[in-house]
Amino acid sequence: SDPELVKAKYRVDAIAFGLGSFRSKQTPKVETCLRKGVNFRIITMMPDSPYAAERDKEENKNNGTTSYSIQQLVEWADKLNSRSMRGKVIVKGYSCMTLDFYWRVDDVIYIGPYWYGVESQQTITYKYLAGGKGFTQYSEYFETLWNNTDLCRPLTQLTEATSRRRKR
């Protein structure tokens, strides 16, 4: 679980696979965030990407597991977006291998590697705070990916949400 999620005020960004464990455990907290107007932006692999099948091999999962989880993520986001909540969940797919887990809640970023033969929830995670070099580099990298229309394309029916900024 994410201890920072309930504290979210304006944004949650992620680079991940299907977030299956997160979706199964944290949907009520996500709904609370969405009612407050918090927007979620998630970058994942294209479900039909050969990299998704490769990740199945790396995590010793059945072929198609990662693709199915990504498809479920998109359906979950579309279902949440169909409700009248102030915040939205936008999912974009990209055609690259995802090398690191990225999780941002407002001014805190968590980064963790995807290791061969190890399930993604079982690796170390590093924490970066706004104002530091790590936070700046990772947040700028996320924005570069998110805005690259040659690399990323929307997977959810909703393709953009009104941006909320942190109050200073």
Question: Can you say where each PLM-predicted feature lies in the sequence?
Answer:
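PLD-like (HKD) phosphodiesterase/transphosphatidyltransferase domain
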Residues: S1-E54, E143-L151
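HKD-type phospholipase D/PLD-like phosphodiesterase module
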Residues: A52-D100
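Soluble or luminal CAZymes and related metallo-dependent hydrolases
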Residues: F22, S69-Q72, G134
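HKD (HxKxxxxD) catalytic microenvironment of the phospholipase D
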Residues: V89-K127
